[in-house]
Structure formats: C-alpha cells, structure tokens
C-alpha cells in the first residue's frame, strides 16, 4: 500500500508532524509513505486539516484517489488565516473515511462536519518513550514537569504556575522543569515566579530522544490542557513511566487516562495505533 501524506505546512513542531513521523516509522512493514503527489499512490491520508491545501486535495479527488482525513480538533481560524474550519469541513465532505483522534473529538466535531467515522486514539513511539533509558539527575527532588509545544491559551500554563507556587511552599526542594514555547516576556521575567522558586527551562525541543530523557527523569507532569483532543505529550509521559497530576481533566485526556488504567502502557503505543490504522485503510482500498 502506497500512501500519500500531504505535508505542506511550514510548522515543524506540533502533534501533526509528530504523528506523521511516528506513523511513517511504525507502518513501514505494510505501507510506503510519500509526500510527493506526483508519485503513484493508492490512498491520500490527510494528517491534519492545516497540513495541506484545498488544491492538493481537489486534485486527489479528481484522480479518484481514496481520501482519509484524520481529525484531532477544530482548527483555530485565528491561527490559520480564517480558513481552518472551512478547510476542515470541505476535507471531511470529500473524504471516504474520517478518523477521529478520540471519542471526545468525535462528539465535539461530528455535528459540525456531519460525517461519522472511526475513533483511533493516538499512540507514541514506544521505542523512544519508555521507562528504560538515560535519566537526567537533578539536585532537586521531586521533579515536576510542565511542557507545551505551542503558546495556545488552552494549554493554560497559568494554572501550572499557580499550583507550583503552592507545591514549592510544601516541598522546598522541589523543582519545576519547563519545556516548550513561551512568550518572550515569560523568558525575560523568570516565568513570573517571585519567591525564589526552583525552576529550569529546557527550551523548545524537537529531539524525541532528549524529550524522552526529560520525561522519564521527571516524577510528575502538571497537566493543565483544556479540551486537548488527544495530547501527545500526555501519552509520551505515560509511556516513560511518570505520574500525571491532572489540574484539568477534559477533552481526550479522560480517554487516555481510562485506557492506560484499563490496559496499561501497551494501549498507548504506536504499534497498537498503527495496527488499527492498517485495518481501517485496507478497508478503504479493497
């Protein structure tokens, strides 16, 4: 099976890019992935509505190539030149199959696009994100983690910030590790900490191996995201053996937590995810 995955977005960080990289690696036994539309292919898999253009997908439709749309959340028009939701709607109408990242995403988005579909929960690369491996030593203990790929307000850093202040008062030797993108003002003014709190900023990291080292070295993850459809960061942290502290339990986090508690870390692996995708995609091209 040869699959064309459009990859036209200039952004190189985020869930869509991580998913493409993971899917490519774990589907290699049964699929060949191309990002070149000129190459002959059996199927078009849209990893996210903001990853490609209407023109690209119209061409697929004209060539009668089966189209599969993967949906996580409603794209923000404010971040996509006012075209995010209209692109999502059009792609859904043209798709032969829609795959939602979580049951929450299906419940939220299905009434808008009026297209039923499957639910396949995300999985992460279990060969990288695992309890075994290098750990980073810290003179402080316990280590709390807060990580956000982007500065979207729904990540709610302010909640982690507020709660960590109280954690620090109760645990003077604790430290907060911060990973990801933050405003220049946060970086300049010590993330608004004002009582000598212990913290370390690791920067925006696009190296999965280093991320795994950080995640497995942390004791707790302060999870604050509001209605994230299926947090890759949360899944990766679970696979590394850490313990999330849910300061917000909304969106797909409910399902991730339930699946982990019912089936263990194996359910959150890319192996399980790609097995389910294989079955779904084979049904489209038969």
Language-model-detected regions and their locations in the chain:
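N-terminal pre-catalytic "stem/leader" segment of glycosyltransferase-like enzymes
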Residues: 1-48
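Active-site proximal beta-strand in glycosyltransferases
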Residues: 44-45, 58-77, 99
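Acidic anion/phosphate-binding donor-loop and adjacent secondary structure
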Residues: 79-80, 124-140
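Short alpha-helical donor nucleotide-sugar binding micro-motif in glycosyltransferases
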Residues: 92, 213-218
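Carbohydrate-associated surface elements
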Residues: 104, 123
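Conserved donor-binding/catalytic core segment of Leloir-type glycosyltransferases
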Residues: 135-155, 161-168, 177
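Nucleotide-activated donor-binding/catalytic signature segment of Leloir-type glycosyltransferases, i.e.
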Residues: 188-205
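Aromatic "clamp/platform" in nucleotide-sugar-dependent glycosyltransferases that forms part
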Residues: 225-226
């Amino acid at each position: 099976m040869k699959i064309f995955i459009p990859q036209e977005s200039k952004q190189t960080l985020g869930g869509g890019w991580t998913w493409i990289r993971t899917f490519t690696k774990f589907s290699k036994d049964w699929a060949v992935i191309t990002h070149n539309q000129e190459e002959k292919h059996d199927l078009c898999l849209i990893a996210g509505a903001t990853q490609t253009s209407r023109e690209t997908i119209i061409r697929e439709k004209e060539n009668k190539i089966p189209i599969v749309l993967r949906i996580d959340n409603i794209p923000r028009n404010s971040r996509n030149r006012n075209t995010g939701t209209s692109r999502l709607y059009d792609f859904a109408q043209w798709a032969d199959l829609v795959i939602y990242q979580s049951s929450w995403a299906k419940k939220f988005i299905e009434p808008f696009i009026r297209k039923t579909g499957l639910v396949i929960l995300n999985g992460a690369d279990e060969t990288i994100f695992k309890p075994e491996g290098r750990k980073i030593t810290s003179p402080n203990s316990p280590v709390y983690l807060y990580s956000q790929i982007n500065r979207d307000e729904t990540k709610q850093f302010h909640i982690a910030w507020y709660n960590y202040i109280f954690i620090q008062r109760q645990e003077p030797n604790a430290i907060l590790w911060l990973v990801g993108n933050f405003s220049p003002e946060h970086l300049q003014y010590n993330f608004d900490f004002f009582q000598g709190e212990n913290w370390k900023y690791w920067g925006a990291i696009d190296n999965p191996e280093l991320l795994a080292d950080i995640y497995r070295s942390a004791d707790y993850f302060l999870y604050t995201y509001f209605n994230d459809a299926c947090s890759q960061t949360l899944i990766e942290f679970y696979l590394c053996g850490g313990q999330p502290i849910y300061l917000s339990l909304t969106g797909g986090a409910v399902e991730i937590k339930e699946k982990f508690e019912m089936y263990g870390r194996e359910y959150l692996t890319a192996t399980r995810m790609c097995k389910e995708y294989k079955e779904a995609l084979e049904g489209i091209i038969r």
